[in-house]
Design a protein with these regions (language model features):
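RNA substrate-binding interface of SAM-dependent RNA methyltransferases
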Residues: 12-16, 40, 71-159
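Active-site/ligand-binding-proximal alpha/beta "capping" segment
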Residues: 154-192
Length: 192
């Protein structure tokens, strides 16, 4: 059962078997059928006109999303906060890296990048569907994290404190800064 992308509902799956590249495409289609998701078969020409990619692999899904906020989640455990990340591929990479370390919650704080961007989804290699991810402004995020007694750990290479000296408790938020500007002042001021 998927948890991620907040509250996402799969509605339709569009397929073009002429474009399939993997061996598990029919298994995936069967899983959608079991969940009573509508399967729409398309010609190669029509599929290519709908796809975001230059060389699509024959499967395209349509989602209806619901905007969620930090209050919509029962936060516990480590949280990755992506502060003003600009490039969708970088956000997707952070998602899959966070999952490798068992993070279940990711906040895109003051997000420049749309968390539903196809490049975010693709570069997360599917892990976006196994996490809670949402966008929120930094001030609200700091406020909620403090109310929940979270340690705020800024990954700042110019910090006087070393990450090596930190002994995490159960609830901590790891802050990763933007590609160009690093960590915002609000996160530096509120770091543990």
């Amino acid at each position: 059962e998927s948890r991620g992308l907040g509250d996402v509902y799969k509605r339709q799956l569009y397929v073009c078997s002429e474009l399939f590249v993997g061996n598990n495409n029919f298994e995936l289609i069967d899983q959608f059928k079991i969940k009573q998701i509508r399967i729409v078969k398309l010609s190669k020409k029509v599929f290519n006109s709908l796809s975001y990619r230059d060389k699509p692999d024959g499967i395209l899904s349509l989602f209806i999303t619901k905007k969620l906020t930090i209050e919509d989640f029962n936060l516990s455990g480590p949280i990755l906060v992506a502060d003003s990340i600009e490039k969708p591929g970088n956000l997707g990479t952070m998602i899959r890296t966070a999952r490798a370390f068992n993070f279940l919650n990711i906040i895109s704080a003051d997000g420049v990048t749309d968390i539903y961007n196809p490049n975010v989804i693709r570069s997360s290699i599917g892990h976006i569907f196994n996490i809670n991810i949402f966008s929120e402004d930094s001030e609200e995020t700091v406020s909620v994290l403090k109310k929940l007694n979270y340690d705020i750990i800024s990954l700042d290479p110019f910090s006087e404190k070393s990450i090596k000296s930190y002994k995490p408790n159960k609830n901590y938020a790891l802050i990763v800064g933007s590609e160009q500007y690093g960590i915002s002042d609000i996160w530096k001021k509120n770091a543990s």
